[in-house]
Amino acid sequence: MQKNDDLLRERRKDEHVALGVKQNEQLAPSSLEDIQLIGTSIPRYNVKDIDLTTTIVGTNVPFPLYINAMTGGSRHTKKINAELAEIAREVAIPMAVGSQSAALKNSSLIDTYKIVREINPNGMILANISPEVALQEGLRAIEMLEANALQIHINPAQELVMQEGDRSFSHWLTRIEEYVKLSPVPVVVKEVGFGMTRETVKTLADIGVQTVDLAGKGGTNFAQIENDRRRDQAYDFLLDWGISTGQALIDMQHQDAPKIAYLASGGIRNPLDIVKALALGADSVGMAGQIIYSLKKEGVTKTIEKLELWKEQLRGLFVLANAKNISELKTTPLIISGELAKWGALREIDLVKLANRK
């Protein structure tokens, strides 16, 4: 039985990658398109003046992008993790591995995650677990990677669509609080593409969580992935569940939103999307599906070249926004329009204040 469970987990990991790559073949419309930065025609800064440095859980990083959690736990995904680690090392960006549950249950799979630290010995690596994982096991996940931080992913919608998924969630908050108090490294609580509301973020902040990844809808859709894995595809009605990255970001502009650090991910497509997310308060921006898609289609070298180009393009966008660094960018005026503006108004976000920031 144990062997069958291991095989099922390995197959699921491979299916996640294959279906995720397929989803990223065509970029979906993004709620970030409803966000417009108000720039300048007389910039104060030169491109060489721009400082893209940011901080993630107390660690300074030179570029506000990270490779978000996606994979590990099978022979095939070991190769992908190795290539992602090479990209992270060369571009000097943090990287999170996918859920390490498989390796915690089957030690023969540890190397499919550990390869990340072997290839990127000095980089910022985030371990990744579910709130289902008991503390001692979670500490093993951190040790496995010599991780700099721990991602705890919260994914009730995915679990409910997954036939073999969890059905009990009421203990999650207590478990997360235990990690916050006892983890030897900082904790980041992240969604998996269904987005966090300000109420969810407040619930987490109240137990001591200091950083969240809002991880909105718009990128890799794990409800669809799990539904596609089902023979009956019985959860078609849930494929649009959640809030988008744009919605999650403007929700954090509400006067009652908790004042904690947040990251943004979910449907990030280009440097302009990154700038919009940073301008709405994110400290850094995560990508998973698009990077794996680029890796699969173009290889490691081309993906590195693409991300290096993004650095230069990002500096240019900061110039246009009249911002020398991320702190200044967070005061750039923004116009929210379309469906995102309607949603924001119903959530009582002061869109006029956003449009006239200084």
Swiss-Prot record:
GO cellular component terms, A-Z: cytoplasm
Domain of life the protein comes from: Bacteria
Alphabetical list of Pfam families matching this protein: FMN_dh
Cellular compartments annotated: Cytoplasm
Keyword field: Cytoplasm, Flavoprotein, FMN, Isomerase, Isoprene biosynthesis, Magnesium, Metal-binding, NADP
Required cofactor names: FMN; NADPH; Mg(2+)
UniProt GO molecular function: FMN binding; isopentenyl-diphosphate delta-isomerase activity; magnesium ion binding; NADPH binding; oxidoreductase activity
Enzyme Commission number, as recorded: 5.3.3.2
Catalysed reaction equations from the record: isopentenyl diphosphate = dimethylallyl diphosphate
Main localization of the protein described in the UniProt heading: cytoplasm
EC category: isomerase
Binding site for FMN: A69, M70, T71, S99, N128, K190, T220, G267, I268, R269, A288, G289
UniProt: Mg(2+) binding residues: E159
Sequence positions that bind substrate: R12, K13, Q158
Gene3D superfamilies: Aldolase class I
One GO term of the biological process aspect: isoprenoid biosynthetic process
Role summary: Involved in the biosynthesis of isoprenoids. Catalyzes the 1,3-allylic rearrangement of the homoallylic substrate isopentenyl (IPP) to its allylic isomer, dimethylallyl diphosphate (DMAPP).
PANTHER family in UniProt: ISOPENTENYL-DIPHOSPHATE DELTA-ISOMERASE
UniProt xrefs under NCBIfam families: IPP_isom_2 (TIGR02151)
Subunit structure and binding partners: Homooctamer. Dimer of tetramers.
Family: Belongs to the IPP isomerase type 2 family.
Protein name: Isopentenyl-diphosphate delta-isomerase
Organism annotation: Listeria monocytogenes serotype 4b (strain F2365)
